[in-house]
Amino acid sequence: MMDATKYAPGYYPVPAGYDSWVKKDHVEKAPAWCSVDLRDGNQALIVPMSLEEKLEFFQMLVKIGFKEIEVGFPAASDTEYEFLRTLIEQDMIPEDVTVQVLTQCRDHIIRRTFEAVKGAPRAVIHFYNSTSVAQREQVFHKSKEEIQQIATDGAKLVKQLSQEYEGNFLFEYSPESFTGTEVDYAVEVCNAVLDIMQPTPDRPMIINLPVTVEMSMPHVYANQIEYCDKHLKYRDSVILSTHPHNDRGTGVACAELAMLAGAQRVECCLFGNGERTGNVDAVTLALTLYSHGVDPKLDFSDLPEICATYERVTRMHIYERTPYAGQLVFAAFSGSHQDAIAKGMAYRKEHGEHRWTCPYIPIDPHDIGRTYDADVIRINSQSGKGGIGFVLEQNYGYNLPPKMREALGYKVKSVSDHSHKELSAGEVLRIFEEGYLNKTKPLSVVEAHFAQVNGITATVTLALNGQCKVVTSVGNGRLDAVANAIQSATGMDFHLENYSEHSLDEGSTSRAASYVGLLWGDGSVTWGAGTHTDIIVAGIQALVSAINNK
């Protein structure tokens, strides 16, 4: 048995009155984004990226649109140091991108960091020390005053070296393990650092309040953010930043609520990479904003390519249900879901809708480089007529009547059920063609001639079980006349219950598709389909196919 008595909440709620953010129902603009993939993400990999891989990843982040990129902890390893020097010396940092470097508040590490970053066109020096109760007591064995001294000593050295080294430097301070720190004490430490750094509106400083470990529900963190928003000094000269992790599975919620509460900047990783359960997912955050009509200022229009590069370089797998990015996130197997999606797509097309409102799909898959045929409607034993019909129409142009879709659906689901697998669009087409299209055994129409005398007179040459027979009959139209001729020659008892047709292609050589449903004397219904450049021939082939399905 598990023993819950060994656990208790380890966070520090703020006093009442710091929850005005709850009146807001959505984030109205994108934050400043900072990718920490090359530091937090890289340090969490089983095999960290090589120099060449980091360069490729950096270029991908730039292409996506990140304007701030944490490129590493240059004092931690030669690879991290050389990566930063390569970016600077080979002039690989675009004019609108600022690199960020991480350093602990320790003299020799700060000095090594400035050695690495000298000559950078723009760089954020991100210095930090841990402030939580657990870290103070168990790791550092220091008092609050001593921990604050570490922060202020670090700030003094950072400020001093920024004046000695060549470069354009901005500054960021993080009270690491903020979520396990008394919030008033965290503010006290941050304000002491701000007093040293003396930010101004035109040279602001970043104060980053990390969810180093998720310890509370997201609204508790949002209240803490609002408290800091109200109590930090130099507020018009401070960029309030958040850095959520995902230990409780609510990293995205933490970031969103923090933005409602005053956070202006988010540090994040692609696909939620990072220590333990990962950092907050930049893709989910950005595309969730996008789904509310907010420009995220990040370009994920070719998300499959980004996914492929990420998986190759990091050797990590993107889970199939990862929001927006996973292989199955737009997939509908359920019959009722497929039917609603198919109808939603049809409604959108018929009404020329610009705003996206399709059931079950939060954003248009095309916007992020996904396709309807491969990503949305997926066929297995749970699928329904709507989805199966959608696959045939989207991929091959066949717009089956609803009742025929239902009949085909039973065949398709049976094949999937017995084979215990998902069916491709090609396999669905094969089942349709083999079961309904242009069937010529045991009955076929060899030729038919028509004359308009007291209606339509058809002279039809039939082949039944290899025997030919010529029959003449009258009907209200050509197809009715042929049907009457077949019944006269064979004694079959059926009624033309359903007929529809449409063009499969465009142009003078386009093919027509026809569908026929027959109601038989015993109450059963059979279906057939025909295709031909001559619409009359297509209709006759559909009729014959329906007869042959009896």
Question: What is each model feature region?
Answer:
Residues 2-9, 33, 44-68, 84-94, ...:
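Alpha/beta enzyme core
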Residues 2-39, 293-472, 508-511:
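A mid-to-C-terminal "edge-of-domain" accessory segment
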Residues 40, 44, 74-78, 132-134, ...:
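Short, small-residue-enriched loops and turns at beta-alpha junctions
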Residues 93-103:
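A glycine-rich helix N-cap at a beta->alpha junction
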Residues 209-211, 239, 267-275, 287-299, ...:
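Short beta-alpha connecting loops at secondary-structure transitions
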Residues 216-350:
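Catalytic alpha/beta core domains of metabolic enzymes, predominantly
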Residues 451-458, 466, 472-524, 533-534:
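A conserved regulatory-domain signal marking ACT and ACT-like small-molecule sensing domains
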Residues 524-527, 531-550:
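Mixed-charge, glycine-accented linear interaction segment located at domain edges/termini
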